[in-house]
Amino acid sequence: MALDTPLSRAPAIAPEPKGILDPATGLPIGATDPTFLSINDELADRGFLLTTADDLITWARTGSLMWMTFGLACCAVEMMQMSMPRYDAERFGFAPRASPRQSDVMIVAGTLTNKMAPALRKVYDQMPEPRYVISMGSCANGGGYYHYSYSVVRGCDRVVPVDIYVPGCPPSAEALLYGVLLLQKKIRRTGTIER
C-alpha cells in the first residue's frame, strides 16, 4: 500500500516557465520597444520595410550574439542552466561559442583573482569588435563575499569594460537572461557602426 502524502501526489514534471517579464510594466520584454512597434506599424501599413544599412546591421547583430563563458566559480552553473532547454537562450539569438575569436559577448561569472586578471584581459583582447561584457554575480561585480581578500579583484570592471551587471549570489538563470535582453536593447539603442 502506497503512502498518500502531499509529495507523492505532486506531479512529476516541472511547472511551465512564466517567461521573461519586465518588472516595471509586467509585459514581456520587447512588447513596448519602439523599434519593434515601428516595424509592426510599417509592415501593417505598406507590407515592406525601408531602412538604413546601420539599422539593418544593428538588427542582425542583436539577433545573433555569440557568447563565450568565462566561468570562474559557482555562478557558471546558472550560466550553463540558461543555455539548457528550460530557458533556451538560443531562441533570443544568443548562442554559445568556445573561442573568443568567434564571440561577441563575454560573460564573467565568479570571483576574479589577481592571478586570473591578465588572462581575462588577454581573452577580452582576442574578441573581435564590437565586443560586450556581462558581469554576472556579486563576486564579478564587486568582489562579493571575498571583497576584502588580498587576492581578489574588486570587480571585473577594473580589468575590462562592463556593459551589463547582473546582481545576485548566484543570480538565477532568469536574471542572466534578462541581462542578455537588456544588452540587446542597449545594442539597438546605441548602434554598432562607428562613424
From Swiss-Prot:
Q: Which UniProt keywords are listed?
A: 4Fe-4S, Cell inner membrane, Cell membrane, Iron, Iron-sulfur, Membrane, Metal-binding, NAD, Quinone, Translocase, Transport, Ubiquinone
Q: How is the cofactor bound?
A: Binds 1 [4Fe-4S] cluster.
Function description = NDH-1 shuttles electrons from NADH, via FMN and iron-sulfur (Fe-S) centers, to quinones in the respiratory chain. The immediate electron acceptor for the enzyme in this species is believed to be ubiquinone. Couples the redox reaction to proton translocation (for every two electrons transferred, four hydrogen ions are translocated across the cytoplasmic membrane), and thus conserves the redox energy in a proton gradient.
Cross-referenced PROSITE patterns: COMPLEX1_20K
Originating species: Methylobacterium sp. (strain 4-46)
Q: Which reaction does it catalyse?
A: a quinone + NADH + 5 H(+)(in) = a quinol + NAD(+) + 4 H(+)(out)
**SUPFAM superfamilies, per this entry?**
HydA/Nqo6-like
Name the cofactor(s) required for activity, per the record.
Answer: [4Fe-4S] cluster
Which family does the UniProt entry place this protein in? Belongs to the complex I 20 kDa subunit family.
Which protein is depicted?
NADH-quinone oxidoreductase subunit B
List GO BP terms, alphabetically.
aerobic respiration; electron transport coupled proton transport
